[in-house]
């Protein structure tokens, strides 16, 4: 089976925060799981280096957009690597390959009659002497009356045109823009009304899209899909490949989602492999992003794929809700965020991955609390999982000189482990990652109870053979926990595998166990709870 996983492309205009990771982490869990199952996986993403936010930040800082994009693209790569993300291809939208691929998509849509020219009115800033596309305009959303950008309202997820906004201002200088005529290209989205309606009906029937994606897409379909502008007067981006219009750029909402396609093609060129199997109707496709990106993946991207004749319509949409911070809405402008480069300096990446999975905003907004983060590490990772691994391995090191005693696998434990692979695998495939991880940790708590009830420290004196059986079965559980937890906690799983000399990484029970163990070290260190107050003070102190 061919599995295509696309992670949303973060704007390269500022550091990643935990809200980004909360929405993107499911992609890596899926990729690791399907690879362990032996499936053919292509997991792609990249940095959005063409967006309006980058141009705005560059102008504000007096540097080039390329300098801003380079800085954050490199930082993103480091952060994703340090968090254990396993992209098969992580690229950027300002690459020559991406530009060429997107231009081919644009021309194909133009040739098929899905793109047309139209004279329209657009916001124009007389102070800055330029037309103002999407995010260059700010104001009030006409639907919910919250503050919004010219492309979208984060409060109600409405897709907007800058002229829709009330109380419009220029993002660059703050003046009120005028309205002038200009010519642009439009995407005939209305022609895909019935096809998109069918796509969402199937997703609803099969339960393969998150509820928020189904509800929002149904709303747009019910209102009637509206044609969308696909060109903009921007300083950076992919030039329109039509003579006389080279100064205009392809609008980021169509260009960025086409990044999945360009990354796939780039991967194929670099590896010499064929990517066609990821774009046919048999492919299982997963698109992983936050709820603010839903319409781009549930309406626009399917329509583009239909327009260019590709069959791999988004099968699964994994659209998480928002992550708040200490009960307040995350805000980059107010510096109310937990920044990824910062948290990685002090905390175990598996601790971050664990918390953002068990506390994931899968169906509702959830909160990142420093207190809950540190207590979850100490009680679950250290107190439950780390404790079971450490007490078992230390027992072997102390009483058996590192030689794993031999025995037979308990039938009840074997059935439990086999059931875990089935149940956890199903939960991952159904994108209920919190359920999957909690299921494993229920088994970890069962394992600690098993150790306590068997009392090997007493068995060693009273019944040495029974003690060997107990420890052998504990090693069996540890080996399988490392396997089951690898999609979620890759770093600690690798350490356990190394200690047990386990090579097999398949998604199946580990029945061949090691003869000896080496270099037993604690899997996790306790975090001083005094850090809670320190981190909260730091957060409030940095807020604007």
Curated annotation (Swiss-Prot):
Enzyme Commission identifier(s): 6.1.1.10
GO terms for biological process, alphabetical: methionyl-tRNA aminoacylation
Residue numbers covered by motif 'KMSKS' region: 329-333
InterPro entries referenced in this protein's UniProt entry, alphabetically: aa-tRNA-synth_I_CS, Anticodon_Met, M/V/L/I-tRNA-synth_anticd-bd, Met-tRNA_ligase_1, Met-tRNA_synth, Methionyl/Leucyl_tRNA_Synth, MetRS_core, MetRS_Zn
Gene Ontology MF: a single term: methionine-tRNA ligase activity
GO cellular component terms given for this protein: cytosol
Keywords: Aminoacyl-tRNA synthetase, ATP-binding, Cytoplasm, Ligase, Metal-binding, Nucleotide-binding, Protein biosynthesis, Zinc
Xref: Pfam families: Anticodon_1 (PF08264), tRNA-synt_1g (PF09334)
Motif 'HIGH' region: chain residues: 10-20
Cofactor note: Binds 1 zinc ion per subunit.
Residues annotated as binding ATP: 332
Primary role: Is required not only for elongation of protein synthesis but also for the initiation of all mRNA translation through initiator tRNA(fMet) aminoacylation.
Quaternary structure, from the entry: Monomer.
Family: Belongs to the class-I aminoacyl-tRNA synthetase family. MetG type 1 subfamily.
Name of the protein in question: Methionine--tRNA ligase
Native organism: Bacillus cereus (strain G9842)
